[in-house]
């Protein structure tokens, strides 16, 4: 239904936006090499904590978005170079499309859509593969959002804005929206699933196919423009506490999952639950913003600056 697509679509933008904001902060960070190593270590430990919070989703050592952040911190010099050098940025963009072409027509390097396979960590080889290619949030292709975020962070425009309102931005959004509209029409005519976490014919999250990358990048750019132009302080509060919220939100999410298993929710019930749950975290960020010292972000800053 359209409600399911709307709620799932907004939820699907959370991770891309999270990674893009991380890239934006990465290029603006003044941390030393030792500080970055400490941050990466803490993020890996937090990934373990998240996995333990959600045994119904992950194995203890399953790589996820926080282990992705750890890798991004460790390769920060490379990301900064691509963000500040137009030629490097262009080469990176072309490389991403070439790798997708290779994966689609020659050899599937992203693994299967089976969830159990993507979270399984039976041996070191699989663990490393999940970190870079076949996991839930592997370095490829999710590094793309970080590089774009870093690019925006290094190109401040008028009034301190990072995403310029120009013809290039408008053209990118139009191309992305056109792809989504055309693919939605084709999926409807074919009777196939347009977008799905693991079974999407055109937009697939696990693994993140090229359609998902186009659609989510378009959505994030639109969302970024809206927040930038309207200067919505509530979202700014969430941005400051994004890591704390991400780690903590798995605790009640696990409880909600147990409730859903006991009684199957309808699409309307599930959608309403998502809206209420999301709103609750917005309010949490507004209140907790006064207690910045009591956040995971503050803890990481303190440990990495010592």
Where does each model-flagged region fall?
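Alpha-helical transmembrane segments and their immediate juxtamembrane cytosolic regions
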Residues: 1-306
